């Protein structure tokens, strides 16, 4: 059975546009409600500035904005996702003045001054082992001393390849927006999955697109060792979340 998570890669831009119409529907049915509950206490005391890695369409951006008065740097490489995010900001003049949208990936982010916090929700799996060391270096360079790195994470058993299964179906007017997925290959910490996005009318598919993506799920011990090697210290966080600080 395929895991239900945000699957996005910093190197996939317009190819991921096929998922944009399904994005909020699927993620509101997935990890986003839990993150809304778990993230706010981890941002307590943050007042000046936050980087959000992989802002997507802005679902978590709004959570950050509600819980802190800080300026937000929303990093999003996908043009399709970024377009929805900017349109969402345009609906609220207060957010439009606080959120700077950066059209780049996590490895290329640079902001004007060190920030108090970096938030990264369902993005870490996009980075293979050979890129994560650079990721930690880049993020550490953006944080002020004592700054916090917050992300969601949990241990996972290696999935078994299988058949395509419907993971969610959502009514939009008289249409059903359907997301299906299957694991194609799993080895070590890498899992290659296929996702199919269909729009159905009276049960008949009138639109169908697919994306194949490889995600990377290191063991918790390895992840902790990488972060410590990059100079981070672990801080307390609820189950399902991680918080690490620079000394």
Where do the model's predicted regions map?
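A short acidic, Gly/Pro-enriched loop at the edge of an enzyme's catalytic core
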Residues: 110-118
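Class I SAM-dependent methyltransferase SAM/SAH-binding core
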Residues: 59, 64-108
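Conserved class I S-adenosyl-L-methionine
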Residues: 1-56
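Conserved beta-strand signature within the Rossmann-like core of class I S-adenosyl-L-methionine
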Residues: 146-153
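C-terminal lobe and adjacent flexible extensions of AdoMet/dcAdoMet transferase-like proteins
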Residues: 216-247
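A short glycine-rich, Lys/Arg-flanked "PGG" loop and its adjoining helix->strand segment in the class I
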Residues: 133-145
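SAM-dependent methyltransferase
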Residues: 153-218
């Amino acid at each position: 059975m395929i895991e239900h998570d945000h699957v996005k890669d910093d190197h996939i831009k317009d190819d991921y546009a096929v998922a944009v119409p399904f994005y909020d529907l699927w993620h509101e049915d997935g990890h986003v409600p839990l993150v809304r509950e778990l993230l706010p206490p981890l941002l307590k005391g943050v007042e000046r500035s936050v980087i959000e890695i992989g802002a997507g369409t802005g679902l978590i951006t709004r959570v950050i904005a509600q819980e802190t008065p800080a300026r937000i740097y929303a990093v999003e490489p996908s043009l399709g996702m970024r377009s929805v995010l900017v349109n969402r900001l345009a609906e609220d003049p207060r957010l439009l003045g606080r959120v700077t949208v950066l059209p780049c990936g996590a490895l290329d982010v640079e902001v004007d001054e060190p920030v108090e916090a970096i938030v990264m929700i369902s993005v870490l799996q996009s980075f293979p082992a050979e890129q994560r060391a650079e990721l930690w270096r880049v993020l550490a360079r953006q944080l002020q001393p004592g700054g916090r790195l917050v992300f969601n994470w949990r241990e996972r058993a290696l999935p078994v390849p299988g058949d395509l299964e419907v993971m969610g179906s959502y009514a939009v007017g008289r249409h059903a927006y359907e997301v299906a997925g299957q694991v194609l290959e799993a080895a070590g910490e890498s899992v290659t999955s296929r996702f199919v996005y269909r729009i159905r009318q009276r049960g008949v598919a009138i639109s169908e697109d697919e994306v194949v993506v490889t995600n990377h799920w290191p063991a918790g011990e390895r992840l902790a060792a990488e972060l410590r090697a990059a100079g981070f210290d672990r801080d307390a966080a609820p189950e399902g979340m991680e918080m690490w600080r620079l000394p």
